[in-house]
């Protein structure tokens, strides 16, 4: 079985968030199961690859051509499409993102002709479901890919007969994610709990009705973690290796983390995107009480400008209690996972989440909200703590409960958990078989 993963990002070539980790790791785990899986990405700026050909495709009624590159990393074959509009620094965040990714998808469908099945990821690849046998994965329902219908049908050449409620239409616009849900043979999302939640008005982002209508082909498969990449026993970013059996090296990591940040323990760490989805407003509101109780806060990430300003101000006002690193720095992230006393994952909603898995693997227990994949991965009261209420008091309660029950002991128990891709890969192989009938 030959499967082409089509996505906007994949580790280690291009990474913005957890989507990249999934697309980089799943194909590697599928190989031993008899699935030949390759990854197709846009040829983003700065990526080096060997040019292996050219792809001809139609866009806006005319033929275009895009160079096709190839690169092998970690045993995975990556293909890069150099369509117009890419070659820039960022993966997302440009005014013409819809046009760029539709052009990419139309070129990708030509590459897909050589495969049995397409595995399309999020809105940027959803269009493939209209052209090829597709398994479509929703990583985050909040980003749906809304496009003006006049532009969409001009760019793609698809018939206007698709612009109705049972197909692509969504409140007067084309919704690419809706198209993926409707036209894919199977739809997956990244945790069992999130698959249930998105069928409700609270979490469905306006697509709950569509998802309920297509519930028969919806599966929730928990993301795995690349346990070769995230392994404290051989992590090159740590000052000393450690394992659950011999955790002595963790003390070295804590010491190095303290030296780098200037924060005395106990330190609560947040590593990830600066986004209100991630519950950072709760962290800011709870911060005065946390500092009063003797906790320190380390925050690392980029994203929303308002949140960035708020954490910069918090650091200025509390130089001994808060440290903010507004950057993507993998070395510091690994040190935080290993050296903090706990990680905070207070999300409003969370399709799966990788931070809580990585931290657990590094023996640092999570304090997480009981939503989505966090419910499926954090063993409450044994290897971390879950809290229900989206309120600063809920977060404070979770932090206090963790330390009352024993944060260090919970961290050691968290290291026992199996977050490898082996189980999820088997589940995806079964979904592929269903999709191919």
UniProtKB/Swiss-Prot annotation:
It holds the Pfam family Glyco_transf_5. Keywords: Glycogen biosynthesis, Glycosyltransferase, Transferase. The keyword Phosphoprotein does not apply. Its EC number is 2.4.1.21. One of its GO terms (biological process) is glycogen biosynthetic process. ADP-alpha-D-glucose binds at residue 15. It catalyses: [(1->4)-alpha-D-glucosyl](n) + ADP-alpha-D-glucose = [(1->4)-alpha-D-glucosyl](n+1) + ADP + H(+). InterPro entries: Glyco_trans_1, GS/SS, Starch_synth_cat_dom. Pathway: Glycan biosynthesis; glycogen biosynthesis. One of its GO terms (molecular function) is alpha-1,4-glucan glucosyltransferase (ADP-glucose donor) activity. SUPFAM superfamilies: UDP-Glycosyltransferase/glycogen phosphorylase (SSF53756). NCBIfam families: glgA. HAMAP family: Glycogen_synth. Belongs to the glycosyltransferase 1 family. Bacterial/plant glycogen synthase subfamily. Synthesizes alpha-1,4-glucan chains using ADP-glucose. This is Glycogen synthase. It comes from Thermus thermophilus (strain ATCC BAA-163 / DSM 7039 / HB27). The lineage of its organism: Bacteria, Thermotogati, Deinococcota, Deinococci, Thermales. The gene is glgA.
